Amino acid sequence: DFGDAVVDLNEGNILKNFQYAFSTGASIDSNEITGRIILAETGKTDSTLFAVLYNKQEDSTVAKQKPMYVARVDGQGNFRFTNLPSGAFYVYGLGDVDGNKQYNQPIEQFAFLDSPIVVSTTTPSVQLYAYAAEKEKPKASSSASGDKARGLLVTPNLEAGALDLLDSFRLRYTKPIRKFDPSKTRLVIDSAETVNNVIFLNDSTRNQLIVIAPWKAGNKYRLFLDKEYATDSSGLTSIKNDTISFRVKTEKEYGTVRIRFSALDTAAHPVLIVYSGSDEIIGRYPLTGKEFYRSMFKPGNYKLALLYDTNQNGVWDPGDYFSKPKRQPELVQPLSNPLLVKENWDNELVIDMNAPPKKQ
């Protein structure tokens, strides 16, 4: 399989998927395997993946030996092996990060079938679901959280100076906070009254301070931060007084959402996943019935999907090829119905689960 390696001499046009077959015997093998690889976590496809074939299965084979056959995956997730001999083959999908066509990094996408495929002239198409056993760790940021001239920098999670009623008020820092003095802070409502019983909590990364207070919708607040109220892990501290002014949104700035599902299999433990326009997960909602309702939902355009949550922990879980028994990944099904939420509006959507699946 030459892939895209063959081009014409004058224009450089690619001769796509060119294959050259030859035989050392009197005939050429004519069997084939076709299939598709889908990313289990998103339901999408990835044209950088490969499908690979082995004629034996031991847990270490895919990590230590080169495959017998390799096929590229196209933009629809499809692959095809041609000119195969008769016999049994083990089919895998691989996101080959290091270029060695072996599965030896847990951050690589990987897919496997539970049993071998017996190749003949009528071999059925196969479906594989790829997963990464571990997430790729983000690279450490080389940027500092400030400098000695400016001091410690803080970024509140406000939208145009407003606090989301459905979110916590958070103060974000680029480095973990090592020292914090709440006595050097003061929260004021409507420019006059001091708010008592304000609690500051460090999140698990210590890069955020969560501010807990009895917020009142529609009111204006100011958070006063005196100098040296906080110090990060590099020893950088706030060198001057700071004030964060904001308001809390009102309920009218949200919409209600009602989604009705037809033919939804609740026995499969579906979880509704809501994505922002940039594919960031903004909510996961286990579905115990065929209707989802929220009295307050942030306005915007959203994408939807269903996670079939086998172990009922509320999040997607990858597979495990090396466990006993092997475990396939949980599956996510993208839904073709977009969700548009308008402010101060009853937003309704009906989703037919019997409708044709979304094209990738």
Describe every region a protein language model picked out.
Residues 1-360:
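N-terminal targeting or signal-anchor segments and their processing/structural boundaries
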